[in-house]
Swiss-Prot record:
GO terms for molecular function: nuclease activity. This is Putative pre-16S rRNA nuclease. One of its GO terms (biological process) is rRNA 5'-end processing. The lineage of its organism: Bacteria, Bacillati, Chloroflexota, Chloroflexia, Chloroflexales. InterPro entries: RNaseH-like_sf, YqgF, YqgF/RNaseH-like_dom, YqgF/RNaseH-like_dom_sf. NCBIfam families: RNAse_H_YqgF (TIGR00250).
Length: 142
């Protein structure tokens, strides 16, 4: 596989969780959480991370329903992805994010993270789950 660092995003109404892969695009790790508003500032921060980290692709979580249909947030995420893609010099794609926030919260609880700290970390952990699922799906497409 070509060496390429991939950024994963969990875009929420208030915050955007950010995760990053290793250069071999095998392992995802939480990176940071940035405010979602104003969107222009969030996009500028993401663009800066892409440039600083040598990111070759961005993966954004797509909120699907349990039936695999576009959820109520999907249109807003699509607008964000379109605006982000317009300023980046790398591909931006969406990937199913079903249940990632639930999994992230459970993971943090299992690690003994105090409830007050979970809110600070949940978005970037969810982004790392989205990105890891994406990386795994690329390696094992079936």
């Amino acid at each position: 596989m070509n060496e390429q660092t991939i950024l994963g995003l969990d875009v929420g109404e208030r915050r955007i969780g950010v995760a990053i892969s290793d250069v071999e695009a095998r392992i995802a790790a939480p990176l940071t959480t940035i405010p979602a508003h104003p969107p222009e500032r969030a996009i500028a921060q993401i663009a800066r991370l892409v440039a600083e980290r040598g990111v070759r692709r961005v993966v954004v979580g797509l909120p699907l329903t349990m039936r695999g249909e576009h959820g109520p947030q999907a249109a807003a995420i699509q607008r964000f992805v379109d605006a982000l893609a317009a300023v980046l010099n790398c591909p931006v794609e969406m990937f199913d994010e079903r249940l990632t926030s639930v999994a992230a919260e459970q993971m943090l609880r299992n690690l003994g993270v105090k409830p007050a700290k979970i809110k600070e970390q949940i978005d970037q952990v969810a982004a790392s789950i989205i990105l890891q699922d994406y990386l795994d799906a690329r390696r094992n497409p079936f």
